[in-house]
Design a protein with these regions (language model features):
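Bacterial N-terminal signal peptides
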Residues: 6-16
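Catalytic cysteine-centered active loop of the rhodanese-like fold, especially the PTP/DSP P-loop
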Residues: 132-183
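Active-site neighborhoods of enzymes that stabilize oxyanions during catalysis
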Residues: 187-197
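Short, solvent-exposed loop/turn and secondary-structure capping segments
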Residues: 108-111, 158-161, 187-188
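Positively charged, proline/Ser/Thr-rich regional signature most characteristic
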Residues: 70-153, 194
Length: 197
């Protein structure tokens, strides 16, 4: 009888503690991925603390509009809007992720492996993503890139995308992560401090 009592106590008190360790997956089949950054490999996981809450910087629901207006789901014809799982798959394939936010936002925290090209500079820095400068940009060898900013209410990456398109970047080579940092952080995904560019 004593053994049954001990076993029952273990099931009710110890098993939940064991189950909590590593119980927050990205999907039911994926716990983490590792991406290469300039500082070495970084593991992308979700926060394993079931009581964690979103970063207070992204908890606000109402920001003055303009400038913080809700952005359209489709930022431009031909540009594909993606969610978190598509971002992770893009990362796994070594895709180039662009943090289109200002440097001040970028250094506070960014998606690991992302490159900071602020929306105010992107039109003059297309050479960093496969275009060649001439009388006009030649983007025939442009890389497929994924851009993000702060989230649904942030216009920095949509502004960057429109600037890229205006300069001749092919829409089919641009992915737009509309949920941005707010969506990334709401899922407890890994964030690192950005570097000054």
């Amino acid at each position: 009888m004593k053994n049954v009592l001990i076993l029952t106590l273990m099931v009710f008190f110890v098993a939940p503690l064991v189950a909590q360790a590593g119980n927050v997956g990205i999907t039911k089949d994926l716990m983490s991925i590792t991406v290469q950054t300039e500082k070495g490999p970084i593991k992308i996981i979700r926060n394993q603390d079931n009581k964690a809450v979103i970063n207070p910087g992204f908890a606000k629901t109402s920001r003055k509009c303009p400038p913080f207006c809700v952005q359209p789901h489709t930022v431009a014809p031909g540009v594909q809007t993606v969610g978190e799982l598509e971002v992770i798959k893009f990362m796994e394939k070594g895709g180039l992720i662009i943090d289109a936010r200002t440097v001040e936002w970028h250094v506070k925290g960014t998606i690991p492996g992302s490159k900071s090209i602020p929306y105010t500079q992107i039109a003059s820095r297309l050479n960093e993503i496969g275009c060649k400068k001439g009388a006009k940009w030649d983007c025939s060898n442009a890389k497929t890139v994924l851009l993000f900013c702060n989230g649904l209410w942030c216009g920095q990456s949509p502004t960057a995308i429109r600037a890229m398109l205006r300069e001749g970047y092919p829409a089919s080579k641009i992915l737009y992560y509309r949920n941005g940092m707010q969506g990334w952080q709401s899922l407890g995904l890994t964030v690192i401090e950005g570097e000054m560019s």
